Amino acid sequence: MDEYDEDPGRRASKLMETLSIYDVYQDGMYGEPNPDMEKTKRMNGSSSTPGNKVYSAAPVRSVNGNRASVPLDFCSPQREAVYPDPDVYCTKSEVALPCYSGASDRLRRYTHAEVQGHRYSTGCAYDGLVLGKQVAVSGARSNSLCMSSPDGRYTATSPRSSLASSHSSQDQSKHTSPRSSISSPRSSLVSPGQGEGTSVISPRSSYASTASDTSKHSSPRTSLNSYDCGSKPSSNRTSGISMGYDQRHISPRSSTTSPRSSYSDSRFTPAGGHDPESAAVHGIPMASPRSSICSQPAVAANCVVSPRSSISSHSSRSSRSSRGSMSAYPELQLPMLGPGLPEDALLQDFTEPNGLHNNRVHLQTFPVLEEPQQQNSEVNIGFNYCKAGAGGQRFKLPYQVTPSRDSGPSQAERRLEALTLELEKELEIHMKKEYFGICVKCGKGVYGASQACQAMGNLYHTNCFTCCSCGRRLRGKAFYNVNGKVYCEEDFLYSGFQQTAEKCFVCGHLIMEMILQALGRSYHPGCFRCVICKEGLDGVPFTVDVENNIYCVKDYHTVFAPKCASCNQPILPAQGSEETIRVVSMDKDYHVDCYHCEDCGLQLNDEEGHRCYPLEGHLLCHRCHLHRLKTPLAPHPPPSYPLHVTEL
């Protein structure tokens, strides 16, 4: 234990002097080790006493994207204890994997196939680590370093991670200096505390520091996973830097939380045992890719931050993290809501036979060991990457999901619709409708315009006027009457009825459509027209002459009406009347107005004194007639005098 009494900064300097990871800094991006920087500088001018120092993790990238300088002296005693031979470091094609086995497994190298298989099984090209394997250090720009504390605890890091240091629960001060933090473009270092635990911070995810009783971690789009015996990173993208500080140095701006992050305090979760071969970490809470933070009590905080990882923090008091900001008040408890984070609602467990972890996990809860008074206010949700979980049991989510109903109307809705239609039909039947008459086929009354059908001068129900052959309703369709039976067009044309069909009296063609019968003859409706004006006479009064030519009433009177002998105009019936009034005298026809005395204009009729006395074909009254004769009037007319009788 004497070597742990030494200044941690000096121990770190001794370790880094002999590490082959220095090869990374030969590309000119980092300066050479400076022997003058072997001692730890004070941060912000504050002093620290030996045994009570906390070294802050310096992020590789600043907020503006520049790379920070990296000191090269860090934790040599731990390196000498874990890596006695510098030749056991990994090459560029290998990835450092955390170690839980004895010294015989520590010198094992992992092949490129194993590394690639694990990288893509975790959802990231670099972040895959398997617990229970030998820790190796990779060179160039994909370096990872894992160091152990004296009690044999290890922490896995991501190839794109940086350094974070955590110490015992009594550490209260932090210092930043070129020698107190180490960063590389894609490297990670783990600094052991005073026999407690280790922490690793990603250079592209967050800046985190663990202090006295509270460990705080933040990442723009990550959440933190850590455990006493190891941790595993998940994959997620990051887009910024979030700073975490001790609560005594906190500012009001650092306690804000991300609207898209959720929190779960897992301090009541016991630090269960682990299986080195299956790499089952039963107490590791896992946060979702959208930044869930879980915290769990432990003797010291082990922190793993991956640039594309989900992170869970186990601290002695509490852990806070959010996307882009965090809360540093340990007394502020933020329990995770049950239905929160829809993307984390379904988590399943499937692990490949070789120990590599897939992207699914399952929810686990653990019994409460301490602080039972806060049991009701928080929900403990643990995440297990492995198939064998010895310390947990599966449980249902704290809310029930209502099963989705099948698409389409339900049985009750269909039944309601059927009842509604039936009721509408009944109402329509019983509703009082207009009465049209009696159906000539069934003898029942016809109610409603929709039920009335008129054809061939008769009234039918719509359902009664059907084809005799196929039973189709013929309302509004062409039909054929054959010997008192009606047929539809299809049955009439293709059933041999053409031989018995009637022919039009006008054109002589077979009547295939509607038939019009008049004067004992059959006509096409289009052929039954006036021979003078050619207007259709279907449903219009008409008349015929002796030759059976068809005339409308107007044209018939124009052609066949008698002409007045006085005005020589046809004598037509009065407007609105069908009767013709005329006066017949001397076998001539006269209008009533034209029948008057030609000399004096006296209206002539059958009355006494108005009678007509024609003379030489002229209409004369009795006085005018004598005047023309120039003869004296006899008291009695001679017997040979003709008497004219007017006919009306």
Curated annotation (Swiss-Prot):
GO biological process, one term: cytoskeleton organization
InterPro entries: Ajuba-like, Ajuba-like_LIM1, Ajuba-like_LIM2, Ajuba-like_LIM3, Znf_LIM
Nucleus keyword on record: yes
CDD domains: LIM1_Ajuba_like, LIM2_Ajuba_like, LIM3_Ajuba_like
Coiled coil (residue ranges): none
Molecular function GO terms recorded: metal ion binding; transcription corepressor activity
Function: May monitor slit diaphragm protein assembly, a specialized adherens junction characteristic of podocytes. In case of podocyte injury, it shuttles into the nucleus and acts as a transcription regulator. Plays a role in the regulation of cell morphology and cytoskeletal organization. Acts as a transcriptional corepressor for snai1 and snai2/slug and plays a role in regulating neural crest development.
Family in the record: Belongs to the zyxin/ajuba family.
Protein name in UniProt: Wilms tumor protein 1-interacting protein homolog
Organism: Danio rerio (Zebrafish)
Taxonomic lineage of the native organism: Eukaryota, Metazoa, Chordata, Craniata, Vertebrata
